[in-house]
Amino acid sequence: HPNVPEKCDPTNLPILGQGIAIKTACSQSYAGDAEAVAILTALCQAAHVPYQYFVNRSDMRGGSTLGSLLSAQLPIRTIDIGIPILAMHSARELMGTADQQALQQLTAAFFTEA
């Protein structure tokens, strides 16, 4: 977020309009492993879906999802993905419509290939 640049790594941030974000964290606050990332990346490439990577800062607690909990409790491969959002959880969030379209395209490709 531009108002708190000290919370962000300027070399590693999701960009609005550049596709879905594949999220990982060394703290395991996001679900996924190298194999899941490779499978998703291959699916994105085959379906011509734009994607980017987001890695939480390792020196600061970041967001988390239920993905890690689910992957630990269920015998299914799990990976956290999302649409880049500016000012998440604020009164006015901002996203790129192209990213939503990319997510819809990826979802259709996933269920077609599955």
Where do the language-model regions lie?
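Active-site-adjacent substrate-binding region
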Residues: N3-R92
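His/Asp/Glu-rich mid-to-C-terminal helical/loop segments that flank catalytic regions of hydrolases
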Residues: I83-A114
